[in-house]
Amino acid sequence: MTVLEITLAVILTLLGLAILAILLTRWARCKQSEMYISRYSSEQSARLLDYEDGRGSRHAYSTQSDTSYDNRERSKRDYTPSTNSLVSMASKFSLGQTELILLLMCFILALSRSSIGSIKCLQTTEEPPSRTAGAMMQFTAPIPGATGPIKLSQKTIVQTPGPIVQYPGSNAGPPSAPRGPPMAPIIISQRTARIPQVHTMDSSGKITLTPVVILTGYMDEELAKKSCSKIQILKCGGTARSQNSREENKEALKNDIIFTNSVESLKSAHIKEPEREGKGTDLEKDKIGMEVKVDSDAGIPKRQETQLKISEMSIPQGQGAQIKKSVSDVPRGQESQVKKSESGVPKGQEAQVTKSGLVVLKGQEAQVEKSEMGVPRRQESQVKKSQSGVSKGQEAQVKKRESVVLKGQEAQVEKSELKVPKGQEGQVEKTEADVPKEQEVQEKKSEAGVLKGPESQVKNTEVSVPETLESQVKKSESGVLKGQEAQEKKESFEDKGNNDKEKERDAEKDPNKKEKGDKNTKGDKGKDKVKGKRESEINGEKSKGSKRAKANTGRKYNKKVEE
């Protein structure tokens, strides 16, 4: 079809050029004839003038000029009708030629149109119409959200004439794997008439869609009878209804046709939209997960706050094992005391409590066990308060520890004054100020060997209890402010210095007492110790009631905090 149209266009252009050439030649010939006529008339006028000049040379100049002028006017009068007649003839001829040329052009165009129509008619008669004209293609593709695969069968009529080729698709279920390259591309054109789509559902849940696509200017055999008027309207330019139907059909094809034959197959917008929806759902899930995490993160500080409130009166998890180990080294009688003391300790002093729990050395375990049976209850209450008497505010801790420290130092000073005779003042100063624990233990054991029976048990309690008290007091003092420690040490050294000065003065006054003291040191030591211990037991029995009441109040407070 395109070749015939091109040849007709070329022929028409050649005819037009030929007509233009003819017109140009005619116009040139007319011009030449006009020039020839004008030249001939000019020559005749010149001859007449020459003749008149020769004949009337005798006359005067003025008369000659007048006659010559008259002759010229006559010649002009004779020439003008001839020239006017020639111009009129040429114009008439040219007008007739143009009219003929226009008529020829119209005739040629009519012939070309008739030839094109005859060629189209021949082509339509040569190709008999059939229902299977064009390519029949069926695709099965799973659509998300449907119960089963949807079968899409499409019927297209291709412009170029050729053999009918059918590509049967897989009718049973979706394809398990891509079968080679994709099929030939489908040429989908706009629909020329509204044809309702046929939706059929099989027993297996498959939906078959059979849209029919018809190209503009062509029709099927069955539809030709029904839609002749519609097709004529579409050929003339179409109506608003047909345009709306085309747009609707385009959208329907985009949403219905799905190509999933292979990895390289085409995908329509209908698949992309569910993917976007899936991405949106994933994003929503991520947002929900983030919100849950944020809620859990928000819940963590609340839990931490509750843990902090509880841990102010309890022990964190990290040091549970250490505290259990430290409790395992402590005898059974003191386990409950240690646990209660640890429950009342705030965070800042947990390490101090663990150190105070680990005070008991391996070598002194037996002594501590012995001391449990013989320690007076006053000293046990002091130990309990030194360990479990730590409250939230450090002021109460400082006050109680100062009271414990002062009581312990007073008891030690009293014992040292009762134990040490005048002859051993230098040794007592060393033992009280900077004597190591080993020497104290040796001295106390040597002193303990003097007495017998129940006095030996009391001495063993004294041997073990002062060590534990001293170590616990020292490590509990580490939690107290450094300024208070320095003040307490200064006070203890001042007291010791005053006692030493008094003893030196007594020694200077009575030098004979030194010798007596050297002889009777051993006996005096035992007697003084027994007296001091009895006095301390009496004082302890007096203060039992008050300290037991205080300990009971502290235990009740710790139980409330643990709850």
Curated annotation (Swiss-Prot):
Topology within the bilayer: Multi-pass membrane protein
Organism taxonomic ancestry: Eukaryota, Metazoa, Chordata, Craniata, Vertebrata
Compartment list: Membrane
Statement: the UniProt record of this protein carries the keyword Membrane: yes
Entry's transmembrane regions: 3-23, 99-119
Domain of life: Eukaryota
Chain intervals with Low complexity compositional bias: 384-395
Organism in which the protein naturally occurs: Homo sapiens
Main location: membrane
Extent of Basic and acidic residues compositional bias: 69-79, 367-383, 412-447, 485-544
Keywords for this protein: Membrane, Transmembrane, Transmembrane helix
Any GO CC annotation of this UniProt entry: nucleus
Descriptive protein name: Testis-expressed basic protein 1
Residue numbers spanned by region Disordered: 56-81, 311-563
